[in-house]
Amino acid sequence: MSGIWKLKVPGKIKHFLWKVCSDCLPTKVNLMKREILANPTCHLCGRIAEDTKHALWDCEAVKAVWCMDFSWVNWVEAAHGSFLDLVDRLVSKPRVAELFATTAWSIWTHRNKSRLLEKTIPLGSIGEAAKTFLQQFRSCRDEPSSSRGKLIR
């Protein structure tokens, strides 16, 4: 889990991933445990209790997002582990982990907006939006090549 803090993603995404790995996201199951909600059913698929892994990975509504850019993931193996196991496997590959974290954060953001009936992008566009967001973040962090090595007097 310590690899999370080394990822080159915005702080809000690192914090989100830490919450995911600590199982303290306010999923419906976690809210039910705190006696805030009575019904833990996922509002996206309407069939299964919404825990962290379901909300971000197992829900039929979000699987298509992962299939687009993460088709190489062993789905059978991923189905048996926790979301933390999945994160641990990916953090060893920083560029992949950064896209994974940004995509998961984008799915969670979509879930929250749709639950509150706010405007969202279609689920099928989340993968591309996550890539664009990450590219923009990286370009903002990079120093302009023209200013390197020049001394202004």
Ranges and model annotations:
Residues 1-153:
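Primary recognition of RNase H-like, Mg2+-dependent phosphodiesterase/nuclease domains
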